[in-house]
Amino acid sequence: MVRYMQEHFNSRPEELVAAIGPSICVDCYEVSEEVAEQFREVFPEDVLQPGKAPGKYQLDLWKANQSILLRAGIPPEHMAVTNVCTCHNPEYLFSHRASHGQRGNLAAFLMLKESWVPECLTGIKKI
């Protein structure tokens, strides 16, 4: 997404703001050795923790996504993580694991605060 914004909107990564929304947390996301190995190849950082069972690992998707954003040039101070686990909040959010395969949808509504609107957009009529 960052690369797309650079190519199509001339965005500079250091000026972008990113949010990581609700998803499964590290405590709830157990993965196999095979999945863990694939993540180790891409993320040498600490995105895996020892699992609760032998040969299992807890995967931190929030850290993995922050790592992707850092590599893309987004400064850490321009990132926000909701720290809301979909598995811990099934009454509000859908979780594939918590619902044993039943699925739903999540949506995000984003907007620019007037103070954040870049100069190139200041002439756009407000709704």
Residue ranges and their predicted role:
Residues 1-127:
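Active-site microenvironment for binding and transforming phosphate-containing groups
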